[in-house]
């Protein structure tokens, strides 16, 4: 066989093998969106960040108010964030406390977005450079963290938060934290 054919053939076989491994993981129930987080069971690693609307600065104390919180990392440039936004508004109307981090975004665009689509967040923090997202281990927006009233992370979800994700994954954890309060 010609040496020029070996490299593409080997590359093809590696790709087929990787695809097969992923199919097996999915068949065994592994969620391809599930991302391990070294922060589960640890305090939110929040640096001091500025409020999107005011000159206020916030730190870890906003997560230590004695009640569970959803921390939602989002951006106006993110189409999946747009898809989940209506559901976040619904959760906020139901009394779920949500704090947002506007990730790698321009403040003016974020303010307009929230004005046009509604603001589900009790507080919106700016993370224009993405440094806090990096501390949280964010791979991209949106990501949602379930945090207890002492500021400890209990769950991380990458991707849009919708009814199915809420019912099956996040709400049971959130409800346990509400009852524990």
From Swiss-Prot:
Residues 38-175 form the Thioredoxin domain. GO terms for molecular function: disulfide oxidoreductase activity. Disulfide bonds join 78-81. Keywords: Cell inner membrane, Cell membrane, Cytochrome c-type biogenesis, Disulfide bond, Membrane, Redox-active center, Transmembrane, Transmembrane helix. InterPro entries: Periplasmic_diS_OxRdtase_DsbE, Redoxin, Thioredoxin-like_sf, Thioredoxin_CS, Thioredoxin_domain, Thioredoxin_ResA/DsbE_sf. Its main location: membrane. Residues 1-3 are cytoplasmic. It holds the Pfam family Redoxin. The chain crosses the membrane at residues 4-24. GO terms for cellular component: outer membrane-bounded periplasmic space; plasma membrane. GO terms for biological process: cytochrome complex assembly. It is found in: Cell inner membrane. This is Thiol:disulfide interchange protein DsbE. The lineage of its organism: Bacteria, Pseudomonadati, Pseudomonadota, Gammaproteobacteria, Pasteurellales. The gene is dsbE.
């Amino acid at each position: 066989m010609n040496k020029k054919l070996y490299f593409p053939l080997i590359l093809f076989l590696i790709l087929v093998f990787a695809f097969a491994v992923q199919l097996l993981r999915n068949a065994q129930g592994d969620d391809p969106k599930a991302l391990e987080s070294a922060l589960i069971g640890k305090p939110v690693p929040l640096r001091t960040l500025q409020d999107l609307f005011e000159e206020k600065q916030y730190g870890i104390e906003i997560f230590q108010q004695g009640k569970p919180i959803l921390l939602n990392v989002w951006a106006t440039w993110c189409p999946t964030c747009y898809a989940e936004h209506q559901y976040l508004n619904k959760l906020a109307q139901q009394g779920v406390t949500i704090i947002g981090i506007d990730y790698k975004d321009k403040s003016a665009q974020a303010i307009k977005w929230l004005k046009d689509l509604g603001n589900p967040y009790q507080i919106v923090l700016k993370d224009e450079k993405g440094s806090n997202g990096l501390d949280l281990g964010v791979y991209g927006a949106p990501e949602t963290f379930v945090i207890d009233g002492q500021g400890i992370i209990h769950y991380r979800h990458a991707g849009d938060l919708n009814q199915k994700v809420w019912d099956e994954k996040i709400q049971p954890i959130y409800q346990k934290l509400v009852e524990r309060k």
